[in-house]
Amino acid sequence: MLRPVLAALILYAVSLILSTSTHAQTVSWSNRQWRVTNGGMAGVARGNPENVHIDANGYLHLAITQREGKWTSSELFTTDRLGFGTYQWVVEGDVYAMDPSTVLGLFTYGPTAHIGVDAENEIDIEFSQWGNTCGDCNADFTVYPSTGHRVKEGKSAWEDNFHVTGGNVTTARMEWSSTRITFTLMKGTQPIGSTANVIKTETYESTTENIPQVPLPVGINLWCFKKTPSKDQTVIIRSFEYTAK
């Protein structure tokens, strides 16, 4: 017969296994494996795997919502690292007019795989009004420097904050090489290589010090900047594609 304390410990361990297995920590989507996180994302609303799911069409759903009285957000990363090439997401939802505190990030990021420190090895396409702190901006393109070249106070090597309008479906693309990154937003669903219905495009050219040089995980997150939203937020990512250069 098991002693009461030992029996209690076993029951507790079983309950943990059951609770963590009810929602996948790793998902298969767009022909890649993705690790769903419970990251802090600026500390306002932690990620919760229950906020990430894939529907019958194969679309990825992300949410910011309250669970057990606390606001929670969404974040996932590829389990592999990708290098120079073309990265493309098709996004469904009016990402140009979300709650001002909401941020949708489409990015590559090094620290999640222990590549350098924060504010290095990161390339971002972000949709956000940043709590109305950037004039009338609702999106940005941002590049952080390569390993060992962190800018003072963790600032980016380059960024462009801007205001644009688009439809309910947006194709977001970045083309990354050792000395050049081209960012493009397009209305509707566009194939890789197309430049139809361009909303915004910008190219950053610089030295290898200012542009990441190593393969990085790909991340997608929906999170809160400094405060929580006035109501639940949802975004759908229809697809992600990558073509190596």
Predicted regions and their residues:
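Beta-strand-rich interaction surfaces with strong enrichment in secreted/lumenal proteins
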Residues: S73-D80, S156-H163, T208
